[in-house]
Amino acid sequence: MSDIETFYDVMRRQGITRRSFMKSVRSPQHVLGLGPSFVPKIGEAMETKPRTPVVWVHGLECTCCSESFIRSAHPLAKDVVLSMISLDYDDTLMAAAGHAAEAAFEETIAKYKGNYILAVEGNPPLNEDGMFCITGGKPFVEKLRHAAEGAKAIISWGACASYGCVQAAAPNPTQATPVHKVITDKPIIKVPGCPPIAEVMTGVITYMLTFDRMPELDRQGRPAMFYSQRIHDKCYRRPHFDAGQFVEHWDDENARKGYCLYKMGCKGPTTYNACSTVPLERRRHFPIQSGHGCIGCSEDGFWDQGSFYDRLTTIKQFGIEATADQIGWTATGLVGAAVAAHAAVSVLKRAQKKNEEA
């Protein structure tokens, strides 16, 4: 891989000064939640390590992961694609098409065998020998297996590749299957979401480039740095939940006041993702901030978990102490009763305080 330029080489060729280069290093440092002491290490990695070859393939999907990725602000998607990595194949973003694109695919996986990262967006359908998704004249599942043979690691972008998403929802007529159930002999990083957060996607790539290893994963194979806490734990509407203040109808006064959306079906208490932290840092909206509850799109099988507007009744407890590894899918309890009791206690305490003050 010595013939591949480093990120710093590309920046210098574009006329970027070293001072500006070191400033650019701070964006991934913030996204990854690393302290200032890591800036030199990230800088050294980007200055000395060759850009990582990436092969990005698409199965059954809507391309929302790519749409999210190109909107990354820290770092910018253009810096990732044109400077940090060597994106040698992506049939959505590349200029080549048809036979030229497939030739580039074969050349890349042969030239960088054992050194490239395989990024998978979408999943392979297995019914009818994979004929429900054809790419390059062949079933996508064949292309996936072929590309995975020489990959050093695989990234499953989005809910489709990680868990199956809508195309795998019951009765799943195409037998759409998550990547990890088809490829079982390679390390796989799941980055679920529909779509995943842009900065989470670029953050995973930056981490792998900087430290030359996979990030720490939780028991479901997701990067713990982004998927270790529930959206509910850091939600800006959490104080309203604790105070027993809930939206009862979409057009009521409580909705206009920005109260908690739990009773409207918000899945934040059981969904592990960075939605309630990363978007706020970018000053951009996420569903809860726009007035709609979380639908749990980064959790396994969320399409088959009932209506997006049904109130949750199967979470274990409240608080920010538990992580995905500690409770995850085993969480149980009568949440409806717990919320009612919690709200009642909150109201009684406020009433008691007012009486004491009076």
From Swiss-Prot:
Q: Which GO terms describe its molecular function?
A: 3 iron, 4 sulfur cluster binding; 4 iron, 4 sulfur cluster binding; electron transfer activity; ferredoxin hydrogenase activity; hydrogenase (acceptor) activity; metal ion binding
Give the CC-aspect GO terms. Answer: [Ni-Fe] hydrogenase complex; ferredoxin hydrogenase complex; plasma membrane
User: For binding [3Fe-4S] cluster, which residues are annotated in this chain's numbering?
Assistant: 275, 294, 297
UniProt-listed Enzyme Commission number(s): 1.12.99.6
Q: How is the cofactor bound?
A: Binds 2 [4Fe-4S] clusters.
**Which cysteines are disulphide-bonded?**
none
Q: Where in the cell is it found?
A: Cell membrane
The reaction(s) this protein catalyses: H2 + A = AH2
In the bilayer, the protein is annotated as:
Peripheral membrane protein
Establish whether keyword Metal-binding is in the entry.
yes
Note the InterPro entries from the entry.
Answer: Cytochrome-c3_hydrogenase_C, NADH_UbQ_OxRdtase-like_20kDa, NiFe-Hase_small_C_sf, NiFe_Hase_small_N_sf, NiFe_hydrogenase_ssu
| Binding-site residues for [4Fe-4S] cluster 2, renumbered to this chain | 232, 235, 260, 266
Leading EC class: oxidoreductase
Residues where [4Fe-4S] cluster 1 binds: 62, 65, 160, 194
Keywords of the record, alphabetical order, are:
3Fe-4S, 4Fe-4S, Cell membrane, Iron, Iron-sulfur, Membrane, Metal-binding, Oxidoreductase, Signal
Q: Which cofactor does it need?
A: [4Fe-4S] cluster; [3Fe-4S] cluster
Signal peptide as annotated in the record:
1-45
Gene Ontology biological process terms, A to Z: anaerobic respiration
What does this protein's UniProt record list under function? This enzyme recycles the H(2) produced by nitrogenase to increase the production of ATP and to protect nitrogenase against inhibition or damage by O(2) under carbon- or phosphate-limited conditions.
Q: State how it assembles.
A: Heterodimer of a large and a small subunit.
Family membership noted in the UniProt record? Belongs to the [NiFe]/[NiFeSe] hydrogenase small subunit family.
Name of the protein in its database record: Uptake hydrogenase small subunit
State the organism of origin: Rhodobacter capsulatus
